[in-house]
Design a protein with these regions (language model features):
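Sec-dependent signal peptide recognition
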Residues: 2-8
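Post-signal peptide N-terminal segment of secreted/secretory-pathway proteins
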Residues: 56-131
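Non-catalytic, conformational "gating/processing" segments within enzyme and secreted inhibitor domains
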Residues: 65, 105-227
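C-terminal motif of bacterial Sec signal peptides marking the signal peptidase cleavage site
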Residues: 14-17
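Bacterial signal peptide processing site
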Residues: 19-22
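Mature N-terminal segment immediately following signal peptide/propeptide cleavage
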Residues: 45-59
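Post-signal peptide N-terminal segment of mature Sec-exported envelope proteins
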Residues: 27-47
Length: 227
């Protein structure tokens, strides 16, 4: 049931990471821990477990790709957003995958909102952007509760769009480019007739090295495992 639900729409988890050549950085603000309740700490531990399971599964299915760069947080946020539109067995399977089966949707949403807000404010020397959007085919009915909870808890941009228009992919690609500082300018070539809804998460990261290194000291070499 979960597989059928996921294939009925499209999930795009977009991750862009850019290195900085700028040696300057703002004065770091004092480090502070993210204050979590016991339940929220348990959810964070479960989220970490999901991240490793997700990475392991991707590695198994993408064996022909030597390098993988993925964001389990993006996947978790996408599935959490969709879970707000699910019921019955589909909802149970989604929360089981995320590791949040012992928590209500309200608890999951509140935790995700708190986590994202804390991450965005955690390090002033790092540029971090986390954005969500939902693109609905014009005329396709979506429950108001699904839209409102994703707007409120995930700060999602929700827009109805004429998927038959040749400009539709450009509009979605434009959102992606804007949220990744043009690191990923294109995610769609065309929109198939069967598409009804696109749910996107974009994560942009640009960090400053605490200890800079010279580019001239870096060269491509074969990577070897410990064994």
């Amino acid at each position: 049931m979960l597989k059928k639900t996921i294939t009925a729409l499209s999930l795009l988890c977009i991750l862009a990471a850019c290195q900085s050549d700028d040696n300057s950085s703002p004065q770091p603000k004092p480090r502070k821990d993210i204050a979590l309740t016991r339940a929220e700490q348990e959810m964070m531990d479960l989220g970490t477990d999901f991240a490793f399971r997700f990475f392991n599964q991707v590695c198994k299915t993408e064996v022909e790709k030597p390098n993988l760069f993925i964001s389990p947080l993006s996947a978790s946020l996408c599935l959490s957003m969709i879970a707000n539109g699910a019921l019955g067995n589909t909802l149970s399977e989604m929360t089981d995958v995320l590791g949040f089966s012992g928590y209500s949707l309200e608890e999951m949403n509140n935790y995700n909102k708190k986590l994202v807000e804390a991450l965005l404010d955690l390090d002033n020397t790092t540029q971090l952007g986390i954005a969500n959007s939902i693109w609905i085919k014009k005329g396709f009915g979506v429950h108001d509760d699904f839209v409102s909870v994703n707007k409120k808890m995930y700060d999602a941009q929700v827009q109805e769009l004429d998927f038959a228009s040749p400009k539709a992919p450009d509009i979605i690609n434009g959102w992606c480019a804007g949220k990744t500082n043009n690191c990923i300018p294109k995610v769609l070539n065309e929109i198939p007739e069967t598409a009804r809804l696109y749910l996107l998460n974009a994560l942009y990261f640009k960090g400053i090295w605490k200890n800079q290194f010279k580019k001239s000291d870096t060269a491509e070499e074969a990577f070897k495992n410990a064994d």
